[in-house]
Amino acid sequence: MNKLTTMMLAATTLCVMAACYAKKPEPRPEPELNTTGFVNITDVVPDVILEIRYFSTYNFVGSRIDGYLQPTALLTREAADSLRAVSDDLKEQGYRLKIYDAYRPQAGVDHFVRWGKDLGDTAMKCYFYPNECKDSLFIKDYIATHSGHSRGSTLDLTLFDMRTEKEADMGGTFDWFGLESHPDCGGNPTTGTYRQNDTITAEQFANRMILRRAMMRHGFKPYDCEWWHFTLRNEPYPDTYFGFPVREL
């Protein structure tokens, strides 16, 4: 081995050692764990009422849902700003907003899926799905492996009547699995025309329309199967499903 070859091998060895011991860059957080674009709803809409059902045991599963560490509600900044406009609109009509759920981590969705596959667990059937067989919940899309809530711009909510100091009567409870929860139950939600029926009253249908119109006026789109469910039309993360837990930011 000549002198030149020896020097080249030594230089190569030093370069390899330098690469091995060089400080590695800090890993960037996975997109689904990054909370940068999210806010506490109460920081943007301070007079909103929170009743986070999945932090409690009063929900269709009957236990606190995975990923809900605190009884708070999170949304993307864009969705929260639009919700503030909704709140201001409805306050002029005598209502406040009451939120049941907003951003939902993937762990919560996975919890629903596990529960749905356990056909023997029907503890809350009489409260939320008395007319449905549990083995049909996936077929009818009541439960799915992904949820729009995990994208951060979807929420479930109702009206709180400031005059009566009670929730407005919507003709059905949040998370009721059945046709009674559909916005078109009892009328045409596009025109707001009530249709006489034995399921919901004209007043209940009108209350649903008050919420629906206010949400749509300020950039949210409704969901055909749930009167309480709305998604920001121009959501900032349409293809990202986040996984960080629900807790104060």
What are the language-model segments listed below?
Residues 230:
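Conserved metal-phosphate-binding beta-hairpin within the catalytic cores
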Residues 1-29:
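Bacterial Sec-dependent N-terminal signal peptides
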Residues 21-102, 106-225, 235-249:
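Extracytoplasmic cell-surface/polysaccharide-interacting catalytic and binding patches
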